[in-house]
Regions:
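Conserved acetyl-CoA-binding loop-helix of GNAT-fold acetyltransferases
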Residues: 78-92, 230-235, 239-256, 274-279
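Acyl-donor-binding surface of acyltransferase catalytic domains
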Residues: 59, 66-69, 74-145, 291
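Short amphipathic alpha-helix that is part of the acyltransferase structural core
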Residues: 1-38, 52, 141-175
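Active-site rim helix/loop that mediates acceptor-substrate recognition in acyltransferases
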Residues: 19-62, 172-201, 208
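Hydrophobic adenine-recognition pocket in adenosine-nucleotide-binding enzymes
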Residues: 7, 72, 231-233, 266
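Conserved beta-strand-loop-alpha-helix junction that forms the acyl-donor binding cleft
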Residues: 77, 102-112, 235, 264-274, ...
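Conserved beta-strand in the GNAT
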Residues: 50-52, 57-69, 198, 206-216, ...
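C-terminal "cap" of GNAT-fold acetyltransferases
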Residues: 128-156, 260, 265-271, 280-297
């Protein structure tokens, strides 16, 4: 029997197996298996956002639109599971009210052919940029009228959501923030408040105007890699050099913790951010295309 149903916590091991087998056949460029499997945490935290495909009692595929993912086990492809999962993804995206469905699709091969046949359209790409180890980045300096401090988990959650919502309101790809998601991130065992930096008005530590989060990977990674995960500045405080200084803080932070390489991802349509990162010495190393499908109709 071939069927679809909502994801449950009990499906996590089977979905991980699908992730592993799909990754072995060809995962996203410059993404490690450990990073790919990190999607399990989000699935377990939000099972209502995902669906699985079944053959009999076996999970052979899954989709998690919030993470732009749809994967089918390589041995069970070309049996209609992808098409059914795409329908489920479309319904999940419509229910979430987040606009058109977006999925990561490889640049070529059967994944792209599937997307085209399903009526999806290429929208844009995220570029993975990497800072070469030999590149010298200046130390961050203060911006006039602005001070910085670490985040206070619990105490800053609502203010950070408001800041990020306003800072990314004009972002080319919709970004959604909530107090619940922020609290979940802060509750993870690997969360360190020192990895996040809040920029605020110098005379008011509660008036937040910018944000940066930068982390390092597992100590077992060789070489140890840093990741500037997010840089955001309120529109009214842009063009003062604050984004550049927050970026430089992130680079300095992960290098102080031993990172040899520093990565960040940027939406190709975010031209001003892309210019900044390239000017600071980052170079493109991978492309992650995103394709869309309207959820209405």
């Amino acid at each position: 029997m071939i069927a679809l149903r909502p994801f449950t916590h009990a499906d996590a091991p089977a979905v991980e197996a699908v992730m592993r087998r799909s990754f072995a056949l060809g995962g996203p460029e410059a993404v490690t298996l450990a990073e790919h499997l990190g999607g399990i945490d989000d699935l377990v935290a939000h099972p209502e956002e995902a669906a699985v495909a079944l053959e009999g009692d076996m999970v052979v595929g899954y989709t998690h639109p919030a993470a732009v993912r749809l994967e089918v086990d390589p041995d069970h492809r070309r049996r209609g599971h992808g098409r059914r999962l795409l329908g489920a993804a479309r319904r999940l995206a419509a229910g979430a009210g987040d606009g058109p469905l977006e999925l990561w699709v490889p640049r070529d091969g059967p994944g792209r052919a599937f997307a085209e046949a399903a009526g999806m359209r290429y929208r844009s790409s995220f570029h993975l940029l990497r800072l070469p180890r030999e590149t010298v980045v200046p130390e961050p300096v203060d911006v006039a009228g602005i001070a910085c401090r670490p985040i206070r988990p619990g105490g800053d959650d609502a203010a950070v959501v408001a800041l990020l919502t306003d800072a990314f309101a004009d972002h080319p790809s919709p970004m959604h923030f909530s107090v619940e998601r922020i609290a979940e991130a802060h509750a993870r065992p690997d969360f360190d408040p020192e990895d996040a930096r809040l920029a605020h008005a110098a005379d008011d530590p509660h008036q937040l105007v910018g944000f940066c989060r930068a982390t390092t990977g597992s100590a077992s990674d060789t070489p140890l890699r840093g990741d500037v995960r997010l840089v955001g500045v309120l529109p009214a405080f842009r063009r003062r050099g604050l984004g550049r200084e927050l970026l430089r803080w992130g680079v300095a932070h992960v290098r102080e913790r031993g990172a040899v390489e520093v990565d960040l991802a940027v939406e190709a349509l975010n031209a001003s951010a892309l210019r900044l990162y390239l000017a600071e010495g980052f170079a493109p190393v991978a492309e992650w295309p995103r394709w869309t499908l309207e959820t209405a109709g």
